[in-house]
Amino acid sequence: VAGICEGRVVVVTGAARGLGRAHALAFAAEGARVVVNDLGVALDGTHGDPNTSTGPAQQVVDEIRALGGEAVAHGGDIATTEGAASLVTTALDAFGRLDTLVNNAGFLRDRMLVNLDEDDWDAVMRVHLKGHFLPLKHASAHWRAEAKAGRAPQARVVNTSSGAGLLGSVGQGNYSAAKAGILGLTFVAAAEMGRYGVQVNAIAPAARTRMTERTFAEAMAAPEDGAFDAMAPENVSPLVVWLGADDSAGVTGRVFEAEAGRVSLM
């Protein structure tokens, strides 16, 4: 039986670990060909030990291929024009099309407001907000050109906000502001790009990742008794795959909370 993303080409940013990895594997399981983007940076965005951080995107590509799927790695910095543009060209060169963009990349530099310096503010705003804007801009330009050439796409964008973007989070002024900005960007992009066959939605997920394990260790811990692992990142991915598929036709400009196996429409 064909998956709901059979024939689609999907780009996932920040896809080497956590939610991004779960999304990439889930899309591949539903028949998509996947561009796996990741820089392999540490939790705070700095480059870690080169012996442990090299090639994380390729590792996920290898997982997908081992399961019979198709994928390629992309190691560009999506918060640069060159890196974001090459996301699109990588998809086109490898698979001949681009159907879905999942903006997921990010990291944390948590500080209370009075201790938050400009570097920490700028770095977090750059990866989250600019790292959403630039891939969205370049993918949208491609889809607009396709539509104007008479090849109207059924394109999908899934942006990643957070409960911090909806309600704020103590010690995360930079992160909360960036995630709130992503919501505004989502609403504008949905309004502007609908005429070209592009749907744009956002999720506000809660899941166990490198970013949350340290900050919310107790809440994110996996159960020891084999019970349902409510905070596993794989619980969020079915929603993302559906939003990235043809099946979500007509759904745009919306925000979905996904937590502990539950989905709420905001």
Predicted regions and their residues:
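Active-site helix of classical SDR
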Residues: L136, A178
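C-terminal helical subdomain
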Residues: P223-M266
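Residue(s) in the substrate-gating loop at a strand-loop-helix junction
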Residues: S162
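Canonical Rossmann dinucleotide-binding motif of NAD(H)/NADP(H)-dependent dehydrogenases/reductases
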Residues: G3-V36
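Substrate-binding pocket helix/loop in short-chain dehydrogenase/reductase
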Residues: M112-L113, D120-D122
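The beta1-alpha1 cofactor-binding region of Rossmann-like NAD(H)/NADP(H)-dependent oxidoreductases
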Residues: T54-G55, G75-S86, E118
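A glycine-rich helix->loop->beta "capping" turn
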Residues: C5-E6, L67-E70, T90-N103, R109, ...
